Amino acid sequence: METNKQTILIVDDDPDMQQLLQQVLQVAGYEVLCADNANDGLRLALSRAPVLAILDIQMPEVTGLTLAKSLVEETAVPFVFFTSTGRQDEVMQATRLGAIGYLTKPINPDQIIPFVSVSMVRARDLQQMKAKAETARAIGAAIGLLMAKHPINESQAFQRLHDHARAKRAKIIDVARAMVSAQENINLM
């Protein structure tokens, strides 16, 4: 079994669409997981952590939009929509939920791989931006803690943080996170 294949989750109640997507993606070298309802789709997303989820919006019981909200709240799985409607309100709701892309059915099979490839690059870029923002927040918070404790400016606080990380042979982000976590624990007491 090949372990370096990227996994894509398809959640669509239409078996023909599911089969089309699965065939095209497998030929392109992806491992494909399929679910015909949102609840099974969420279970697969939680247990298998696919690199991308392809969701239909209109499904019985739980919609793809509701599933997307659950993916945002419970996983880090990026998602796109392939749906039979192109209603503006659904497009706006999908965008607000964080959809990476949106295509309306019927889908030309030749569009699937380029759409998925671009969506995955976009998802990776967004994840990197989030990681950088989190790093900046943690370092900024640690600098703020140092400035509150010592009569120093921002540049001096950063230098102290940098020197401390170097002395510990640790990454500056790890030292910053430890400082912030320690302060949060002190605040809970």
Model regions: which residues?
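Conserved acidic segment of CheY-like receiver
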Residues: 2-16, 21-25, 53
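The feature encodes the CheY-like receiver
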Residues: 18, 60, 83, 87
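Short hydrophobic/Thr-rich beta-strand motif most characteristic of the beta2 strand and flanking loop
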Residues: 29-36, 44
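Acidic catalytic/metal-coordinating carboxylates
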Residues: 36-40, 61-66
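Short amphipathic alpha-helix used as the core "switch/output" element in two-component signaling
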Residues: 43, 65-75
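Active-site beta3 strand of CheY-like receiver
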Residues: 48-54
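C-terminal output helix
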Residues: 89, 107-116
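C-terminal output/effector regions of signal-responsive regulators
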Residues: 130-189
